[in-house]
From Swiss-Prot:
Pathway: Lipid metabolism; sphingolipid metabolism. This is Ceramide glucosyltransferase. Catalyzes the final step in the biosynthesis of the membrane lipid glucosylceramide (GluCer), the transfer of glucose to ceramide. Glucosylceramides play important roles in growth, differentiation and pathogenicity. Essential factor in determining the success of fungal infection by regulating survival of yeast cells during the initial colonization of the host lung. Residues 1-8, 359-361, 423-450 are lumenal. The gene is GCS1. It comes from Cryptococcus neoformans var. grubii serotype A (strain H99 / ATCC 208821 / CBS 10515 / FGSC 9487). Belongs to the glycosyltransferase 2 family.
Length: 450
């Protein structure tokens, strides 16, 4: 065999193995979606606990302006089926446009313990971290649930999240008898924050809901509800590392307070900040907090059978591209190797090298093999999407199958050009502000957007 033939054979073997690995990850995400989400949610036992026995939860909603469907997203936490919680609505400007909406929601549900915190303090470039500082300090309970302003949840989500948080508790109690639940003893006056080896963060997979049918919004929805969800579930199923998107996160305030800052620039200070303030230099603070809980405190992560509904506003295709470019540029400074390999996990690229490898090693025409690969890929994506939508049917406008397929195809075709564009720079624009992402993953403010 010639040298070129040998190299071709080796290349075929390598690409076939890689193709199998990529498909294994995809099928793991699909399988997780089918097992965990493709059935009605089971009500949490915690919803029946007396107030004195239930672990208290402080729900924090950081707000900035009028986000999509804001009234309904805020109202969702006022209707939770859980006996003991408070809600904090946090803004940084007393003239914030979200405040009238907050007041309407609070007036409608006077029986819910809720308050507004307005504080303009700044501890870093991340406005969300700045907005959370005072609510963290003033929270009534140690158990915190941070829920983004664009997100809505079903009434049973909180109970199932708290139950997942305390899933380390050993018991021989019957799961069908709330009175025998070990969680009866996990009241605020006796429980302690999680320790190494226990669950220290609970999160949900986000599912996009799109009322404004612009093409950028539809492509974003297709991405979040298929590729992103599938990979998110697969990575979390392996439990090899933290993978948290941050739309909905529950953790202990005490645990957060014991985290050292991952920021090299802050660690170089004579008295570096700890706790939440130590994450101020990062735009992807949720991911960094998840990594710190995982690696520094050795705390596990858990997911429930709930999804968090992420309402997407009107996006142009350019808006969609800019959003994806921004987060790839942030991610490449945090996990460079994974970001460099990302194109190889996309449907079209993996289909091309997979079809070539099979043709080289086993014979066959490349085009039919590629088309078969793409047909299988879209089938897995649709099945994953349907499983995740099991408990949210009827929420959001009707969806056209043809429109979805067009948006899905556009997403797949744009994946490589977007990645290539993201590799050309380390500058991003977020909420009208330009930043440069440096090697540590920190963001440096460059000035106001022109």
């Amino acid at each position: 065999m010639s040298d070129s033939g040998t190299l071709s054979l080796i290349g075929g073997i390598v690409f076939l193995v890689l193709w199998v690995v990529v498909w294994s990850i995809c099928l793991l995400g699909w399988r997780t979606a089918r097992i965990r989400y493709a059935h009605p949610n089971i009500p949490s036992r915690l919803s029946k606990l007396p107030v004195s026995s239930a672990p208290g939860v402080t729900i924090i909603r950081p707000l900035c302006g009028l986000d999509q469907n804001l009234y309904n997203t805020l109202e969702s936490v006022m209707k939770l089926d859980y006996p003991k919680f408070e809600v904090i609505f946090a803004v940084q400007d007393e003239k914030d446009e979200a405040l009238p909406v907050v007041n309407m929601v609070m007036e409608k549900y006077p029986e819910v313990e809720a308050k507004v915190i307005i504080d303009s303090r700044k501890v870093g470039v991340n406005p969300k971290v700045n907005n959370l500082m005072t609510p963290f300090q003033e929270a009534k309970y140690d158990l915190l649930w941070i829920l983004d302003s664009t997100c809505s949840v079903l009434p049973g989500t909180l109970g199932r999240s708290v139950e997942a948080f305390f899933s380390n508790t050993s018991s021989t109690a019957s799961p069908y008898d709330p009175e025998s639940s070990p969680l009866l003893s996990i009241s605020d006056d006796v429980r302690k924050p999680p320790i190494a080896g226990e669950v220290g963060l609970v999160h949900q997979v986000p599912i996009a809901v799109c009322y404004q049918k612009t093409w950028g919004s539809l492509i974003e929805q297709a991405y979040l509800n298929t590729t992103h969800a599938k990979m998110y579930l697969a990575i979390n199923a392996t439990s090899i590392d933290s993978c948290v998107v941050g739309k909905s996160c529950m953790y202990s305030r005490d645990n957060i307070s014991h985290l050292t800052t991952p920021s090299p620039s802050l660690r170089s200070l004579p008295d570096p900040p700890s706790g939440l303030a130590g994450f101020g230099p990062f735009l992807a603070e949720d991911n960094m907090i998840g990594l710190s809980l995982w690696h520094e405190l050795k705390l596990k992560h858990a997911m429930t059978s709930d999804v968090v509904l992420d309402f997407i506003g009107s996006l142009s295709v350019r808006d969609y591209i800019n959003r994806r470019v921004r987060w790839i540029r942030v991610r490449k400074k945090m996990t460079l190797a994974a970001t460099l390999l990302e194109p190889l996990t996309e449907s079209i690229i993996s289909g091309l090298y997979g079809a070539w490898a099979i043709s080289r090693l086993l014979g066959g025409n490349i085009l039919p093999l590629f088309l078969l690969h793409m047909a299988a890929w879209i089938s897995v994506d649709i099945s994953t999407k349907r499983a995740l939508e099991t408990n949210i049917k009827g929420i959001g406008p009707p969806e056209s199958k043809v429109t979805f397929l067009m948006a899905w195809a556009a997403r797949e075709c744009l994946a490589l050009p977007i990645w290539m564009l993201a590799m050309t720079s380390s500058e991003v624009v977020w909420r009208g502000q330009k930043y440069k992402i440096i090697a540590s993953g920190e963001a440096i403010r460059l000035g106001d957007r022109n």
